[in-house]
Structures are given as structure tokens and as C-alpha cells.
Amino acid sequence: MNKQTLPTAGRRRRPCVQIVRGLPGSGKSTLARRFDCLHLELDQRVTSGRIYRWSPKADKVAHQWLKNELYRKMVDDRIDLVVAGVMPRHDGTMGEIFANAFDAGYEVFVKTLGEHPFRESVHDVRPCDMARFRKLMMTDDEVREAVLADETAYSAKFRRWFTAHVHFDFVMPFESEVRNG
């Protein structure tokens, strides 16, 4: 498999966290595995050798595990990371990743995958849950605007860091498969 290195930003390279987000079945895991760094995602916590079936209860436990593991790796190990998950909004897991990256001095690259036009979810997510995910999913511009506008949750210093060190890229799933396949 052809591994990609994380992009560098600026003269002095900061450690990076790559967030790969998108709807279930969009190819997040496939793309995340292509980066040459530690790969963490919710599926790793939930599966433990079984076929992964999404459920709100399992998802809650997995999100907490992911946040704890990412924070530990950022603070203790200071290594490049890639994390894959749905992460529809700025104020959930993605917001905590931003806050931890700010505290640890990380550069953040967010890749948002579009919905795969030819594939059903590989995780047997119910259609009503997929509809809810679609409704919740913020665009990259909406995430950026929400973070920069929220003066109560985010300090001015954080918002300056966010503007300089968080980078967004929208990728159609089949494009990533062709480019990286």
C-alpha cells in the first residue's frame, strides 16, 4: 500500500493530526489507513474482533475512548495522528480534538469526504440514522464559521490559532480511491 505523509505547515514542523470525517460508508477508514502515522478511529474501539454494527450506545463509549486516546497520544507522545469518524459538528468530538490540538501545539488537517454515490453503508446503519447524520453534518465552511463566531466557548487566542493552524479539504470518496488507490 502506498503510504502518504502528513503535510507540513510552516518552517518548523509541528506534529499533525489529520481528521477524516464523513458519513458512514464514505471511505473514511480506507483513506485514513493511507497515512503514515498512528491511525485511531471509533470502529477500532467498538469492533474488538466482531463485525461492527453502529449503535448510539456503543458510539458514546467509543467517542470517549477516542477522545482519551487522542489526548494521551498528543500530550505524551507528540506523534502524528490520523483519526476517522463521522464528526458532523464542531461542538462534539471534533471540537475536543481542536481544543486538544491547540493545547498541545498541533497542526490540524480536516478532510471531509462526500457521501459515496454508489455504496450503501458498510456498517448496517439504519436509513433513519443515516438521515439524521446527513441533517447534522456541517460543511467545512459551517464548521469554520461556527468556531470563529463562538466567543463564549473559544478564546480569542484559540480562534487566532484555529485560523492559522486548522486546514480544511473536501474530497469526494471516489476521488480519494482513484488518487490514492
Question: What is each of the regions a protein language model found here?
Answer:
Residues 2-7, 17, 21, 34, ...:
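Conserved GTP-binding G-domain of TRAFAC-class P-loop NTPases and closely related GTPase folds
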Residues 8-14, 74:
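Phosphate-binding P-loop
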Residues 13-18, 78-79:
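Pre-Walker A (Motif I) flank of P-loop NTPase domains
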Residues 19, 40, 82-83:
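Conserved Rossmann-like nucleotide-binding pocket used by diverse enzymes
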Residues 24:
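Conserved SAM/SAH-binding loop
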Residues 27:
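Conserved glycine(s) of the Walker
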Residues 30-77, 118-120:
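Conserved substrate/cofactor phosphate-moiety recognition/catalytic segment
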Residues 57-113:
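Glycine-rich phosphate-binding loop used to anchor ATP phosphates in small-molecule kinases
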